[in-house]
């Protein structure tokens, strides 16, 4: 059973860990991690969510997921890239770009850390997790920006523009 650590809104660990999908209580936040991956030739990797996904099935988006109990958001970013796409990310190449809070109810939500990194495409091609990913492609920055910001904040869009110049 996957466990998640519970945090306060300011990112302080409460000492509590709960099973994935446990209903949240007021003042509780889970940690989530996103990784923006730019290839050596300047393309961006984006994935199409599984058609069976609970949230946003079939939509093209960035790679990411929940941070497991005892894991940092940076470790989760590296793990998610490997699990979902088979992409190896050097942890030393990660650049922390943004921390945002998303409310799921009036008094609880998610703390989301976004990282950016240059990556090498897998020599044997992407190995997608069919449970989470339907398809994957590499696209120019403009297409990536337009596609993945449909449900994101202006701060996220601004961060992507900064990341493009940084990585």
Predicted regions mapped to residue ranges:
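Acidic, metal-coordinating catalytic segment for phosphate/diphosphate chemistry
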Residues: 1-34, 40
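Short loop segments at secondary-structure junctions
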Residues: 10, 39-42, 50, 118-123, ...
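Nudix hydrolase/Nudix homology domain
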Residues: 21, 57-58, 98-100, 106-167
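Residue-level detector of beta-propeller blades
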Residues: 13, 96-97
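The catalytic Nudix box helix
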Residues: 45-46, 62-96
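A glycine-rich, hydrophobic loop/mini-helix early in the fold
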Residues: 32-64
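Short glycine/serine/proline-enriched coil/turn segments at secondary-structure junctions
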Residues: 27, 53-54, 104-107
């Amino acid at each position: 059973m996957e466990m998640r650590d519970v945090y306060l809104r300011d990112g302080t660990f409460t000492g509590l860990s709960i099973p994935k999908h446990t209903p949240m209580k007021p003042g509780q936040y889970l940690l989530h991690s996103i990784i923006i991956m730019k290839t050596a030739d300047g393309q961006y990797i984006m994935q199409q969510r599984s058609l069976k996904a609970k949230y946003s099935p079939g939509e093209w988006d960035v790679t990411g997921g929940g941070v497991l109990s005892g894991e940092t958001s940076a470790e989760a970013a590296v793990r998610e890239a490997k699990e979902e796409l088979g992409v190896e990310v050097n942890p030393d190449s990660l650049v922390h770009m943004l921390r945002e809070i998303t409310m799921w109810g009036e008094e609880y939500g998610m703390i989301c850390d976004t990282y950016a990194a240059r990556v090498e495409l897998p020599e044997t091609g992407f190995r997608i997790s069919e449970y989470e990913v339907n398809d994957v492609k590499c696209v120019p920055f403009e297409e990536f920006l337009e596609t993945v910001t449909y449900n994101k904040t202006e701060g996220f869009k601004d961060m992507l523009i900064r990341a493009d110049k940084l990585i």
